[in-house]
Curated annotation (Swiss-Prot):
It comes from Mesembryanthemum crystallinum. NCBIfam families: met_syn_B12ind (TIGR01371), PRK05222.1 (NF003556). Zn(2+) 1 binds at residues 647, 649, 671, 733. It catalyses: 5-methyltetrahydropteroyltri-L-glutamate + L-homocysteine = tetrahydropteroyltri-L-glutamate + L-methionine. Its EC number is 2.1.1.14. L-methionine binds at residues 437-439, 490, 605. It is an enzyme of class 2 (transferase). The active site is at 701 (proton donor). The keyword Metal-binding applies. This is 5-methyltetrahydropteroyltriglutamate--homocysteine methyltransferase. The keyword Zinc applies. 5-methyltetrahydropteroyltri-L-glutamate binds at residues 18, 116, 495, 518, 521-522, 567.
Length: 765
């Protein structure tokens, strides 16, 4: 019985690729050094899979930055601003597209479906001259072959590539990107022909767009593309891989009738309805790549349940045509549990990172072919049983409190406009009040203090003294700049989710559970393994200390429940919304303690609320309902005079604006500076938003210092669609990643712009 892996993490078990990339970018190592580290990583991954008994091992899933960017390079679709003049695309052009350079900005980066990975968006139009400009797929196939490993080269499919693209600057938004299919297919044919010549017998096209809600003309593009490729693909086995959700009945019909295709890959972890489609109709003689091992989480597979699913499928597709596979690439999970020496043994026994998941895939394939490893299956069953019965997982008080939430929608008793009046009487803020989003620059010295405290190299007393000095510096700076509502700067926090997770029960943390977010940037999601509660106050000590240093309002700073959920590895033994409600109750306790401590402005960040939106429109309402409800739970009990802020980190709100209004926050600040018009257009079209709103006036992701007049002009544009009594003036995000040399003048200009507009408004009366 055959086994298959859709894709594997690239960073290496100890983030070797990250450090090699950053060393190369900083000019501390050569291109050859980077290539050597990368070749060693690829070789160890291929050998690991071969040794584990995997039959269909992927190649070309490694990337120096991103697989969609690799496809852009393969097709020679380099935007003109990068000055590429043809020939094989090398690191200089490749990394300029990914990261920008001294003279030109990077290409846009956006989220890969509903994961926390980001891809580089192709910029296309009728003028693009496509040409075969990166032979990476063929070179990596040959590289593996030279090591004695026959692999399945993986390409981003042609239709998904075009549907993931955007119209280049200056190209009309009505331009149909799919009209470029006839221009890119000849290059795909060249790549396929070279792979065939190099000895490839299988090839994998990733077409994840098939899980989206697609109009019929888009589905027809798949049929047309593969019909065109059919003669080139003859003599090869071809698998078309989908992942992250169910395929619709229409997409399934399209997929199983594609010309030249031998097998189909499905996510059977998130795609439970797809299973019914397969059982109802599957083309005879074709292969089913059954994605039963979860590529997006870190829990051990329920091998007995997966085996039962696979045995049922055997009857449908035939024993020799069923391939045990993964739900998606392992890019979205951590690399190897072997490096977790500090994780609690019991919790560790419940987990499987990518390296362990490879073994699970192989164990299932062997069991199907009558060679079941009884010891492996028994150990798995014992781990699952221990997880189910462990007292660490279940907290009855939490379960009871969460159950009691049902039946109420947890709204504050009064309207937002009457609350804002009460808050204004208490806070006495000027018109167009200024604030920042929360974090201030994290200096090398500050990181050292935190690291030494964690390693017990300095005492708690020394740590508190150092953090107190930092808070005092940040408060003083904001007073000198004349900012109206202050923040403490978050010097005690390394990460906005980890900081809270470390103080909540039900969370565990890995040492090396890194997952690629984009380029060399990795994140280490907390693991939510059990019921969540708050044993002690988490932020009250620091917020109270900061408030005692100033007469101005000091914001309490919390991360919201939906963001904590969406940026964690979440337990899979209960629905996500139940876990979210538990986190909401823990945050509610904190909000109430901050209020008691005299904090009158409390910000509950929901940076990732939109990120959790399901891929299919039919599932949006249910998600938004519980996500928004979770937010309201956190602050339902506070007084009218306590002002609740929230912050959101993305530009495309238009489709969820009514849910944002339904959150019932008093003030919302938004990461908006890069897409001004997009957001303001919602309000221009007459959506009445009665609460305070602070669309970011400048982009903190850039070191550029915006001049006062530019900021004043931006505020004027906002005042054209928003009432002056609800508009706040703030940067678009936290300042953690910037330097003080950039932050001070930028904030100074921001305050000056707000004061200028106050004068203009006063003289216009």
């Amino acid at each position: 019985m055959a086994s298959h892996i859709v894709g594997y993490p690239r960073m290496g078990p100890k983030r070797e690729l990250k450090f090699a990339l950053e060393s190369f970018w900083d000019g501390k190592s050569t291109a050859e050094d980077l290539k050597k580290v990368s070749a060693d990583l690829r070789s160890s991954i291929w050998k690991q899979m071969a040794d584990a008994g995997i039959k269909y091992i992927p190649s070309n899933t490694f990337s120096y930055y991103d697989q969609v960017l690799d496809t852009t390079a393969m097709l020679g679709a380099v935007p003109p601003r990068y000055g590429w003049t043809g020939g094989e695309i090398e690191f200089d052009v490749y990394f300029s597209m990914a990261r920008g350079n001294a003279s030109v900005p990077a290409m846009e980066m956006t989220k890969w479906f509903d994961t926390n990975y980001h891809f580089i968006v192709p910029e296309l139009g009728p003028e693009v001259n496509f040409s075969y400009a990166s032979h990476k797929a063929v070179l990596e196939y040959k590289e593996a072959k030279a090591l004695g490993v026959d692999t399945v080269p993986v390409l981003v499919g042609p239709v998904s590539y075009l549907l993931l693209s955007k119209q280049a600057k200056g190209v009309d938004k009505s331009f149909d990107l799919l009209s470029l299919l006839p221009k890119i297919l000849p290059i795909y044919k060249e790549v396929v022909a070279e792979l065939k010549e190099a000895g490839a017998s299988w090839i994998q096209f990733d077409e994840p767009l098939l899980v989206m809600d697609l109009e019929s003309h888009k589905l027809q593009a798949f049929s047309a593309a593969y019909a065109d490729l059919e003669s080139t693909l003859s003599g090869l086995n071809v698998v078309v891989e989908t992942y992250f959700a169910d395929v619709t009945a229409e997409a399934y019909k399209t997929l199983i009738s594609l010309k030249g295709v031998t097998g189909y890959g499905f996510d059977l972890v998130r795609g439970t309805k797809t299973l019914d489609l397969v059982k109802a109709e599957f083309p005879s003689g074709k292969y089913l790549f059954a994605g039963v091992v979860d590529g997006r989480n870190i829990w051990a597979n329920d091998l007995a349940a997966s085996l039962a699913t696979l045995e049922a499928l055997e009857g449908v597709v035939g024993k020799d045509k069923l391939v045990v596979s993964t739900s998606c690439s392992f890019l979205h999970t951590a690399v190897d549990l072997i490096n977790e020496t500090k994780l609690d043994d019991e919790i560790k026994s419940w987990l499987a990172f990518a390296a362990q998941k490879v073994l699970e895939v192989n164990a299932l394939a062997k069991a199907l072919s009558g060679q079941k490893d009884e010891a492996f299956f028994s150990a798995n069953a014992a781990a699952l049983a221990s997880r189910k019965s462990s007292p660490r997982v279940t907290n009855e008080a939490v379960q009871k409190a969460a159950t009691a939430l049902k039946g109420s929608d947890h709204r504050r008793a009064t309207t937002v406009s009457s609350r804002l009046d009460a808050q204004q009487k208490k806070l006495n803020l000027p018109i167009l009040p200024t604030t920042t989003i929360g974090s201030f620059p994290q200096t090398v010295e500050l990181r050292r203090v935190r690291r030494e405290y964690k390693a017990k190299k300095i005492s708690e007393e020394e740590y508190v003294k150092a953090i107190k000095e930092e808070i005092s510096k940040v408060v003083k700076l904001q007073e000198e700049l004349d900012i109206d509502v202050l923040v403490h700067g978050e010097p005690e926090r390394n990460d906005m989710v980890e900081y809270f997770g470390e103080q909540l029960s039900g969370f565990a943390f890995s040492a090396n559970g890194w997952v690629q977010s984009y380029g060399s940037r990795c994140v280490k999601p907390p693991i939510i393994y059990g019921d969540v509660s708050r044993p002690n106050p988490m932020t009250v000590f620091w917020s109270s200390m900061a408030q005692s240093m100033t007469a101005r309002p000091m914001k309490g700073m919390l991360t919201g429940p939906v963001t904590i959920l969406n940026w964690s590895f979440v337990r899979n033994d209960q629905p996500r919304h139940e876990t979210c409600y538990q986190i909401a109750l823990a945050i509610k306790n904190e909000v109430e303690d901050l209020e008691k401590a005299g904090i009158n402005v409390i910000q509950i960040d929901e940076a990732a609320l939109r990120e959790g939106l399901p891929l299919r429109k039919s599932e949006h309402d249910f998600y938004l309902k519980w996500a928004v409800h979770s937010f309201r739970i956190t602050n339902v009990g506070v007084q009218d005079t306590t002002q609740i802020h929230t912050h959101m980190c993305y530009s495309n709100f238009n489709d969820i604006i009514h849910s944002i209004i339904d959150m019932d926050a008093d003030v919302i600040t938004i990461e908006n500076s890069r897409s001004d018009e997009k957001l303001l257009s919602v309000f221009r079209e007459g959506v009445k938003y009665g609460a305070g709103i602070g669309p970011g006036v400048y982009d903190i992701h850039s070191p550029r210092i915006p001049p006062t007049e530019e900021l004043a002009d931006r505020i004027r544009k906002m005042l054209a669609v928003l009432e002056s009594n609800v508009l706040w003036v703030n940067p678009d995000c936290g300042l953690k990643t910037r330097k003080y040399g950039e932050v001070n003048p930028a904030l100074s200009n921001m305050v000056a712009a707000a004061k200028q507009l106050r004068q203009e408004l006063a003289s216009a009366k």
